[in-house]
Each structure stands twice: as structure tokens, then as C-alpha cells.
């Protein structure tokens, strides 16, 4: 076995002669040479290595891997950068399934799926993107099956589909739809491993445990990304004709969330620092069933299999809030109902501050076959046997509907300063939770997230194939490109203030949890803006204790905090300015949806932490890609 010294020079020598190498006990496959041309930063402190690729994908979750292997399969020299091993990406935690109108359990139609998604979005979703996603869903699932995703099966061998919230037949006029394709309750795990295998098969070049710092831009065009290799301390500049951001959400801006600790909004913050906008950050989804005390997710599939919520009186209270859909109403509806029950004194437990999810009435064989993962999770994190006891649950931050404004074909957007119309950002694309396509609008339907990853990761590859020739030479660029990013890294690595990263991060999380929560008012949101601004200012007083460049977790966590603060601040300001209730944005002082004034996307700009947040707005796309194929869905009252 090869030994690997910690100097960059010995590592580069090793990589010239092998496609696999060892680091500690971990063997990584790079699927190609990762050495490039070497240089030094202007001050001589940092060893810089340059690479040239057709396409660079930042993030190796479901969206990033689907885009990466699609690009590599099409003949593009493709790099995929990830700050952790790909199969540890947060997609692995997705449980319930992936939506598609396959019709395996009953007659179904992708147009019904589209209707449900538009309604679920509370008419903030762009209908051209929703049209594309729901139409492409069935063929995307069949592709996944061919790639090797081991879907659960019906008795006749078809892909098993379960019920999820907000899904109906006949444009909302029919009964509950069974549209969610599942791999028991470990769908994300199966999907992620399958996509990683495909990416390796198609010779994607992986740069694992590289932390993406900033986008490289020149004359308004995104020309690549600069990253920090945590293993040896080198800085890498990746030149690319297309840079694809697939870095996930920023759930860790909140105190209680279902997100992995790595969900820190890195891609969103990079876009913001580059001077481009983010969209609809005020829309943060609270999942109804996070385990009380830990935040671990209990899939909506548990209710889809027949589970139900009860309060301290043993009442199935969702029948009062959503008489038709009951426990399978949309997530924002269920989360608000739980919060109202707790407020009115019907919570359970000593503090009466949570609810119960009842599964014990389900046959043990159903729990074993369909919900093995959550049975284990409930035992470990709640100490309950689901065959005998209810699971204590509480609404928990789960998903960011907002992100990088993106067209249905994956191209990132800004707005033209002169005309106010949409304008494509040259060289930049996005997909997955980091993007705002916007198929989820103000509220995401359960199991549309994995579909989003697959459909729009695939769309990115198709768009690039239609617009870019493989192997084109790169234009000359300034030799000091990325110097601001290196200066920021150096500043944070040597920061000698009085506040730890952990202290500032905790203050941020508690502020967001308290002031930008399930129910919002002008006073709570204004206080949230003041508080998060005060927290941002303390970032200038941050202290890092580790000055090294090798496996410096203190530095990485400080960089992540910088990214989280950028996302948190824009979330609070955007929420304070939207004076209506729509989807996950529930204002007690503005309880109604206001289509006349607020059926529009929020765009927010912030160049750096503690800089002012600027807001503008762009129209919601209320037409489909082809009105003859699929007419748009006009706004109506959203009730379940």
C-alpha cells in the first residue's frame, strides 16, 4: 500500500502515477489525474494548483452526481468537487421516496401531478419548470431503475408507490394519489449510491474533501471555482466553461433541523459574494415530524402508510384543519396545525410542547417491510418501540425552497438592470436544493425533492450538450484571479478575535429559530433582522485557534459560518418585507395570500457578511412550456 506524505509535492508526484491513493484508512478513486499547473500566491503563503475542465460540478449529492455523470457520459471533461465523501452527502438521508405519475397503483397522469405541485407551491412556483419536472418524472424514474436503483415492488413486480401529502387524482377532485416511488424508507440512500456508481463508471474526476471557497468571475462571466484541499492545504483553481452549483440547502442556520451538519449554504453564499442574487429565501419548510429533542426526520411516508397524529386528548386533530386530506395535507398546513395545538394547550409530554405520531396500529410486517429505517431511528433517538408506543414529534426545519434563481434548463439567472427582465448569468448553472427553479414555490410537496435532483441534474447535462462543444480551449485570464478569496481565507485562518465560531453560530441558530419560525409577525421579523444583523457584526470578532492548513476543522467551520450568516440574513430581511401569508411564510398579521401585490419572487443581494441586503422582485412564470400540451393552473383558494 502506498504511503502518502503531507507535502503537496509528494502528493502530486504520487498522483501522476496512480488513479487511486490512500489517505489515512480511506481509499478514494479520483478517476483521472488531479494534478495541474502549480504556482504560488502573490505573498508566497499558498501553494496554488490550476486545472482546466469543460465543466465543474460543486457538490456530490443527488443533483451534483446526476449532472456530473450526465456530462461525463456526453463526452465532457468533468470535475466534481465535494467537501465530503459523495455517499455521505445529505441526499443519503432522504427517506420516503420520489414522485412520478407511473400509475402502478391506480390510473395516474403527470398533469394531475403538475396540478398538485402548483397548488402545493401556493402559486409561487414557475409553471414552465413544474410542467417540465412532472412531464419528465416518469422517464427519469425508469432511467433510475435501469441504472440500478432497487425500488420496492408490488406483488406483480412493478415499482411500489405510496401516498404522500398534497397528492390527488383528477386535478384535486379525486381521492388520495399513490404516486411516491420508494425504496422502503431509505430511498435517498439507494439513489445516492446508484448515482455515485454511474459517475465513477463514466470517468468523472472527483476532488473529494475539497472545500469550494468562491466562484471565479471575469467580466461578468463565471469561469470556474477556487477550492481548498483539506488534506494537504493546497489551493486549487478550476477553470470551466460551465460551473454547476449543487451544494444543497442551509438548514443549519436554524437550531432545530433535519439537515446534516454539512448543509451550510456554501453555493448560495458563493453566488451572493460574486454579486448575483438569491431568490425566495423567506420560504423555509418546517417538516411536521422531526423527532422531539433531536430533530431527526420521521418520513412523511409513515403517514402515507397509515400513521396519524394525535394530541394530548388522543384526538386525530388534523381532521379539524384539513377535513379531506387529514394527516396527508401539505407540510406547511400540518406544521401550522401542530403549532396551533401546542399553543392551545393540547401538546403532549411534561412541557406539553410536542405531539405524537401513532404507528402502533399498523401490522408489524408493514413496519418491517415499508418503514424499517424509521423504526430503528425512533428506537435510537426517541427510545420508543413503534409497534407499541407513539413517536414524539415536532415541526423541524427541513428544506429551503429558495436558492439560486434558475431556469427550467439549469441556467442561473439575474435580472437586467435596464429592462428588469430575466438575464442568464454566463457560465453558471445550478440544480437541486441550492437552486430555485422554482418548482416548489412557497411550499414543497413531499418526495418532489428527489425528483427535483434527478430531473434538473439531468436537464443541466442536456442543456450543456446542446450548447457547448467538448474540449474548447479556455480564454486567458488574470494570473491573480481569486486573490480576494485567498485573502478572505487567510484572514479567517489567522483571526484573533474574542468570540469562538461555535458561540457566534449558536447565536445565529437561536435567533433564526425564535424570530423566523413557523408563525411570523412584523415585530418578530423586525426583531429577527436586528438580531441577525447584530450577530453578523460579531463575525468581525471571530477567533480561530488552529493556524494550520491541513485538516483544519476550525477553519472549515468558520468558512461555513460565513456562508450560513449570508443566507440567514437574507432570509430574515426577505421575510420581513413579504407582507402576506403564502405557503411556508405564515404571517399572523397578514393571514391571507395577496396575489395582486405579492405573486412575485423575492430577489436578494448581499456582497458579504454584515453588508446591507438589497431586495428586488421578479415575476412568477404563470404559463407552461406548451399551453396546448398542458394548460397552466390559475390561482384559487388553497384548501385540503
Swiss-Prot record:
It is a peripheral membrane protein. Substrate binds at residues 287, 299, 398, 444. One of its GO terms (biological process) is tricarboxylic acid cycle. InterPro entries: FAD-dep_OxRdtase_2_FAD-bd, FAD/NAD-bd_sf, FRD_SDH_FAD_BS, Fum_R/Succ_DH_flav-like_C_sf, Fum_Rdtase/Succ_DH_flav-like_C, SdhA/FrdA/AprA, Succ_DH/fumarate_Rdtase_cat_sf, Succ_DH_flav_su_fwd. Its cofactor is FAD. GO terms for molecular function: electron transfer activity; flavin adenine dinucleotide binding; succinate dehydrogenase (quinone) activity. Keywords: Electron transport, FAD, Flavoprotein, Membrane, Mitochondrion, Mitochondrion inner membrane, Oxidoreductase, Transit peptide, Transport, Tricarboxylic acid cycle. The active site is at 331 (proton acceptor). Its EC number is 1.3.5.1. It comes from the Eukaryota. Pathway: Carbohydrate metabolism; tricarboxylic acid cycle; fumarate from succinate (eukaryal route): step 1/1. FAD binds at residues 59-64, 82-97, 266, 433, 449-450. It is found in: Mitochondrion inner membrane. It is an enzyme of class 1 (oxidoreductase). It holds the Pfam family FAD_binding_2. Residues 1-28 form a transit peptide. One of its GO terms (cellular component) is mitochondrial inner membrane. It catalyses: a quinone + succinate = fumarate + a quinol. The modification Tele-8alpha-FAD histidine is found at residue 90. Belongs to the FAD-dependent oxidoreductase 2 family. FRD/SDH subfamily. Component of complex II composed of four subunits: a flavoprotein (FP), an iron-sulfur protein (IP), and a cytochrome b composed of a large and a small subunit. Interacts with EMI5/SDH5; interaction is required for FAD attachment. Catalytic subunit of succinate dehydrogenase (SDH) that is involved in complex II of the mitochondrial electron transport chain and is responsible for transferring electrons from succinate to ubiquinone (coenzyme Q). SDH1 and SDH2 form the catalytic dimer. Electrons flow from succinate to the FAD bound to SDH1, and sequentially through the iron-sulfur clusters bound to SDH2 and enter the membrane dimer formed by SDH3 and SDH4. PANTHER family: SUCCINATE DEHYDROGENASE 2 FLAVOPROTEIN SUBUNIT, SUCCINATE DEHYDROGENASE [UBIQUINONE] FLAVOPROTEIN SUBUNIT, MITOCHONDRIAL. Present with 10400 molecules/cell in log phase SD medium. This is Succinate dehydrogenase [ubiquinone] flavoprotein subunit, mitochondrial. It comes from Saccharomyces cerevisiae (strain ATCC 204508 / S288c) (Baker's yeast).
